[in-house]
From Swiss-Prot:
Motif 'KMSKS' region, residue numbers: 272-276
Organism, as annotated: Methanosarcina acetivorans (strain ATCC 35395 / DSM 2834 / JCM 12185 / C2A)
Taxonomic lineage: Archaea, Methanobacteriati, Methanobacteriota, Stenosarchaea group, Methanomicrobia
EC code(s) of this entry: 6.1.1.6
Protein's UniProt name: Lysine--tRNA ligase 1
InterPro entries registered for this protein in UniProt: aa-tRNA-synth_I_codon-bd_sub2, aa-tRNA-synth_I_CS, aa_tRNA-synth_I_cd-bd_sf, Lys-tRNA-ligase, Lys-tRNA-ligase_SC_fold, Rossmann-like_a/b/a_fold
Length: 533
């Protein structure tokens, strides 16, 4: 049974109506480590729907949190904004409404591309609309009870002047430098003093926010959250989930949500991703490289409590291969496909996203043979036996491959088709050159040749009595030439790319027009560097 179904079954034993929540502070580039939270929430939500639950999925943008520091990606001029809510800090590029939206907009767009469509709630709007007002009044009135819970659970001493509410200074706009000086529950206002020297009064609705350890359980109560994934840092002993459980029960009279604790995504050899440290690959950036369903698969296949190692270089090819094998087994209704694998595939797919038929590795070959020309890509795709009806999805996959080649591809995955016979062809043996000439003669006599057929033809050269073996024999004047297919593949790559290795030969050869191969192999079979110079 898949982990998402286990969760859904567990929570459905308590109630048939559920609100699955996920929330992230858009303080920097929202990376694929954050993506784990949202995809995990989406999987639980979909599992609930599949079991007939009345369920909703929400994403809460914690855009009323303060800017904590001048992050490495920010200019020093942002020092004056440290302590202000990020919804009130200027946009780094100047094109968005504020700092939070600068990072939030591409993230929400990335979610759409992943087939995830939550209701998006912004914390600043919820506070200003008064959704938290009753929770704020309760927290202020029960300040001592909350402080006692925090001390008992976290083991840390709460300062005498601590308050569960952080007022926003009317003068400097900061919420990290103020102290509560008093409050009026009837008027729903809070008096404050600020380190900037200003003092004043703010409304509870939008005039500040609850501290994190109170804000989180208040949110559960206000919205009725029943399921929520969160990182292992929040789940540590004495952490914010432990304090939140008691606060929501004892202060707000609600039950805490079912917790889905997830581990980090480790980025290659660079460790856990963090927006604040710069160890990050944003979801938007990664969607330029990896098909959406493969990114979903990366999360869906692994239990939340296990860490994920992600490397967008060569290991990405292995991940894509793994997913494509699963996809093919599902499409072919392979009897070896178990229920668990089937469920992984179902949850990795989503409506509204492309599901390309063309293998990623094959597109790597096609794209480079086409030299990046999309019209040529379409011709090769069609020649390779794939439908070109869904041009949008083909372009998306081609764009993925283009960015991968540019940013992450290892050297062995890259190649360029030489316009003329490469000088390296001079290093080929007489037998290799004879093979190229014989291969050109053979494929000229045949009609359309598939990638698999090209592959088998090359291998047939080693078989005594095969058509290709006889043609080679005639050219080298040997009754039965002893042929090693490895040397023949080397001859193919050398004559076209000027290197001894290349992509999967069948895909590679079927990407070219047959006329090009015939001409190139014949020229290579008689290549003389002195005559060519």
């Amino acid at each position: 049974m898949h982990w998402a179904d286990v969760i859904a079954e567990d929570v459905l034993n308590k109630s048939g109506k559920h609100l699955v929540a996920t929330g992230i502070t858009p303080s920097g580039h929202i990376h694929i480590g954050n993506m784990r939270e949202v995809v995990t929430a989406d999987a639980a939500y979909r599992a609930l729907l599949d079991m007939g639950a009345d369920a909703r999925l929400i994403y809460i943008a914690d855009n009323y949190d303060p800017l904590r520091k001048v992050y490495p990606f920010l200019p020093e001029s942002y020092a004056e904004h440290v302590g202000k809510p990020i919804s009130e800090v200027p946009c780094p590029c100047g094109d968005c409404a504020n700092y939070a939206e600068h990072f939030l907009k591409p993230f929400i767009e990335a979610l759409r591309r992943l087939g995830i469509n939550p209701e998006v709630l912004r914390a600043d709007e919820m506070y200003r609309a008064g959704l938290y007002t009753e929770a704020i009044k309760t927290a202020l009135a029960k300040r001592d009870e909350i402080a006692k819970i925090l001390e008992e659970v976290s083991g840390k001493t709460v300062a005498e002047d601590w308050s569960p509410f952080n007022p926003r200074c009317n003068e400097c706009g900061k919420i990290t430098t103020t102290k509560v000086a008093g409050f009026d529950l009837e008027a729903e206002t809070v008096d404050y003093v600020c380190a900037c020297g200003h003092s004043g009064t703010v409304p509870m609705a939008g005039g500040g926010k609850l501290t994190w350890r109170v804000d989180w359980p208040a949110r559960w109560a206000v919205l009725g959250v029943t399921v929520e994934p969160f990182g292992k840092d929040h789940a540590s002993k004495g952490g914010s989930y432990d304090t939140g459980k008691r606060i929501v029960r004892e202060i707000y009279g609600h039950e805490p949500p079912f917790p889905i604790v997830y581990e980090w995504i480790m980025l290659g050899k660079r460790g856990a991703m963090s927006s604040s440290t710069g160890v990050v690959v944003s979801i938007s950036d990664m969607l330029e490289v990896v098909p959406p369903e493969v990114l979903r698969y990366l999360i869906i296949r692994t239990k939340p409590e296990k860490h994920i190692q992600f490397d967008p270089g060569q290991p990405l090819l292995n991940l894509v291969d793994e997913y494509e094998r699963l996809r093919d087994k599902f499409r072919e209704n392979d009897p070896s496909l178990g229920d668990f694998e089937k469920r992984i595939y179902e949850l990795s797919r989503a409506t509204g996203i492309c599901h390309p038929e063309i293998p990623f590795k094959q597109m790597v070959t096609i794209y480079q043979v086409a030299r990046g020309d999309f019209e040529q890509v379409l011709k090769i795709v069609k020649r390779s036996g794939f439908s070109t009806e869904n041009e949008k999805c083909i372009r998306e996959l081609a764009d993925n491959v283009s960015r991968w080649l540019e940013l992450y591809a290892p050297p062995f995955a890259k190649f360029s088709v030489k316009e003329k016979v490469p000088v390296q062809t001079a290093t080929l043996s007489e037998l290799q050159k004879a093979f190229l000439g014989a291969f050109a003669d053979l494929i000229e006599t045949k009609g359309k040749i598939s990638g698999e057929e090209y592959h088998m033809l090359v291998y047939s050269a080693k078989d005594e009595g095969s058509e290709l073996n006889r043609l080679i024999a005639q050219k080298v004047n040997v009754p039965v030439p002893q042929v090693d297919p490895k040397d023949l593949f080397k001859a193919i790559y050398t004559s076209i790319l000027g290197q001894s290795s290349g992509p999967k030969a069948g895909w590679f050869l079927s990407s070219f027009e047959k006329g090009f191969l015939i001409t190139r192999f014949r020229e290579a079979s008689t290549y003389n560097p002195e005559k060519s110079s």
